[in-house]
C-alpha cells in the first residue's frame, strides 16, 4: 500500500492540548483539532471538537460574516440557541447563517463525552462577533459587532451542568 499523503490524517494526530480558555478565564472549553488548517485548506474551517462532560464549546456568540455548521458525531449535547436548550443526537446538524444574530454554543450536560464536527468559513477580517452574555469580554474585542440584529434571549444562562442521574453507556 502506498504511503499516505500529508493531507490524510486522523483527528487524534491533530488534536491540540486541553487548554482552550478565553483570555482572563480559567473555564476550559472543548478540545479541538483544526482539521482544515492542518490539512492544508485555506478557505474552509473544519474542526473536530471533543466536549468533555460539564463543558461547552465557547461563550454564546453570533457572527456577522461567517456561516457555521455543527454536526453531532457522538453523544447528546445541548445546543444553546438564543438562551434556549435543544437536545441533539448523533446525526443532527445545526446551521448558523451569517448576519442573523443567532447566538449559540454547545453544552455537554451529560456524563458522556460528545464529539462534534464544526464547519465554517476561515476567519474573515470583516467578520464581527457578539457575546450577549459576556459583555465585559466583548468590550475587549476589536471585532465586536455593534449593530447585531436584536433577538430575544431565553432564560438559560449558557453554562453547562452535568446530569448526575443520567443513564450511562455500559461500553
Task: Give a label for each model feature.
Residues 1-43, 130-131, 135-171:
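A short, N-terminal "cap"/entry segment at the start of jelly-roll beta-barrel domains
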Residues 41-46, 64-67, 72-74, 89, ...:
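Short connector loops at helix/strand junctions that flank enzyme active sites
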Residues 48-52, 62-80, 119-121:
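Short, conserved beta-strand element in jelly-roll/cupin
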Residues 58, 86, 127-129:
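Short beta-strand segments
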Residues 75, 91, 106:
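Short hydrophobic/aromatic patches on the structural cores and recognition surfaces of FHA
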Residues 83-98:
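Short acidic-glycine-tyrosine-enriched beta hairpin
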Residues 98-126:
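Ligand-binding loop in jelly-roll beta-barrel domains
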Amino acid at each position: 500500500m502506498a504511503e499516505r499523503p500529508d493531507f490524510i490524517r486522523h483527528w487524534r494526530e491533530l488534536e491540540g492540548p486541553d487548554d482552550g480558555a478565553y483570555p482572563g478565564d480559567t473555564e476550559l472549553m472543548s478540545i479541538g483539532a483544526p482539521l482544515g488548517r492542518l490539512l492544508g485548506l485555506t478557505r474552509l474551517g473544519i474542526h473536530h471538537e471533543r466536549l468533555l462532560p460539564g463543558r461547552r464549546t465557547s461563550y454564546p456568540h453570533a457572527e456577522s460574516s461567517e456561516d457555521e455548521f455543527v454536526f453531532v458525531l457522538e453523544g447528546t449535547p445541548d445546543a444553546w440557541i438564543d438562551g434556549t436548550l435543544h437536545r441533539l443526537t448523533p446525526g443532527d446538524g445545526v446551521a448558523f447563517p451569517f448576519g442573523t444574530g443567532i447566538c449559540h454554543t454547545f453544552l455537554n450536560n451529560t456524563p458522556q463525552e460528545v464529539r462534534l464536527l464544526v464547519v465554517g468559513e476561515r476567519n474573515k477580517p470583516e467578520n464581527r462577533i457578539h457575546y450577549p452574555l459576556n459583555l465585559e469580554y466583548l468590550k475587549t474585542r476589536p471585532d465586536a459587532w455593534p449593530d447585531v440584529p436584536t433577538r430575544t434571549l431565553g432564560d438559560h444562562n449558557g453554562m453547562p451542568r452535568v446530569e448526575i442521574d443520567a443513564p450511562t453507556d455500559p461500553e
